Amino acid sequence: AFVGCIQLGAWTPFTLLVFKSEFSYLHPAMYNFLFWSHLAMVVQAFVIHRYSDLRIRASALAVGWYLLNDVVDYFVPVVGTAHHTRLPAEPVVDGAVRHVAPAHEYAAAGAVVLTVVATFLVVATRAEKLRAELDATGEGSA
């Protein structure tokens, strides 16, 4: 959940900002709801870490899942074209979404960077939690 909250919680606001003019059809209340509710997911990740152990195996599985998701969504589609959420900047031609440049690349770059950031944060948060546990027991070094 930690990795997903960061990756998905930050990707939507990123996309809303990068393609702001394309999302202008949204009512301002809906735009703000989508933006802020997804950013709240990033905050939620740091609430989750308070009660989760962020075990290495579970963290590795989550990171692997989101990396696979990025690969399938943007680079190596399983069936047809890329599978990521359709962006208003990508036209539908003859019933099929055309993943045009640079919209597709911007969305892909955002997703991959956020997966890397989430990976760093899960590892760093786990390390800090372990350090705090060791310090609390007197086994850690300053």
Could you describe each region identified by the protein language model?
Residues 23-36:
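Non-cytosolic membrane-interface motifs at loop->transmembrane helix junctions
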Residues 121-139:
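Membrane-interface capping segments at transmembrane-helix boundaries
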Residues 33-41, 113:
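Membrane-embedded alpha-helical segments of multi-pass membrane proteins
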Residues 39-56:
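Alpha-helical transmembrane segments in multipass membrane proteins, preferentially the mid-helix core
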Residues 1-19:
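Small-polar-interrupted transmembrane alpha-helices in polytopic inner-membrane proteins
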Residues 2-7, 58-69:
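Central hydrophobic cores of alpha-helical transmembrane segments
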Residues 13-24, 74-79:
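Juxtamembrane "helix-exit" motif on the non-cytosolic side of transmembrane helices
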Residues 77-81, 85-124:
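Membrane-interface transmembrane-helix boundary segments in multi-pass integral membrane proteins
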